[in-house]
Regions:
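RNA-binding accessory domains that recognize and position tRNA/RNA substrates
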Residues: 1-177, 187-214
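Conserved G/P- and acidic residue-centered "switch" motifs that form tight phosphate/ATP-binding loops
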Residues: 183
């Protein structure tokens, strides 16, 4: 896979200031992935595409993106054409020797003006894959889900989703101070505020030896 498709949920509810929130999320992603040979970051119709370099290690990328607030889910992905034959061929090539007892194709259209519906894409691409692999179609509990996202200039396809941290991008809701005590409540409160977009400044009073180590 050459790209990463990053989806956000809460940001999509924003109004005219939505581009600023997306810009902050892209900034945070760039900071989190610094040094991993990423080649490009693009906002593409309700999602963010990150282009990976040839030296990029996916497992390290996965670990870092999972910690970035503002993301609903993300996936390693490739681009394909609108043509159903060529798209199915590209998917089959990337599937390689993978085996699955059952599968389904789940398609969405980023642009509703495209001259085909999502069910048509699922039926046409899924039929071609079934013809080659012989896999059983299961729309309820498939062993493998092939996700398609149809864009005006092509399509993304990917085979799974990693859960993101959710919330809002860090830096979109101002700064707060958090007094760290010896309990679990203060770090939990800090995490919840970070998830709402706050930049947290941590404060701790080291009072030993005036007070005992227990206090």
């Amino acid at each position: 896979m050459n790209s990463i498709v990053v989806h956000y949920k809460e940001l999509a509810l924003k109004g005219r200031n939505r581009p600023w929130f997306i810009q902050m999320l892209v900034r945070n992603l760039k900071a989190a992935l610094a040094g991993l040979h990423m080649q490009a970051f693009r906002s593409v119709m309700g999602r963010i595409e990150i282009e990976m370099g040839p030296e990029t290690e996916w497992e390290e990328v996965r670990t870092r993106i999972a910690r970035v607030f503002g993301i609903a889910n993300f996936s390693p992905a490739n681009r394909g054409p609108h043509d159903f034959d060529a798209l199915a061929a590209a998917i089959l090539k990337d599937l390689g020797d993978r085996e699955a007892a059952s599968f389904r194709v789940s398609a969405t259209r980023a642009d509703k003006r495209l001259p085909f519906t999502s069910p048509v894409v699922e039926r046409e691409v899924g039929g071609r894959i079934k013809e080659v692999t012989g896999w059983r179609v299961d729309l309820s509990r498939p062993a493998l889900t092939i996700h398609l996202e149809m864009l005006p200039d092509g399509a993304f396809y990917f085979f799974g989703k990693d859960q993101g941290a959710g919330g809002l991008p860090t830096g979109t809701s101002g700064r707060v101070a958090c007094l760290l005590s010896g309990g679990i409540d203060s770090p939990v409160a800090a995490y919840r505020m970070m998830r709402r977009g706050c930049t947290v400044l941590f404060i701790h009073f080291h009072s030993y030896p005036i007070l005992s180590r227990a206090s």
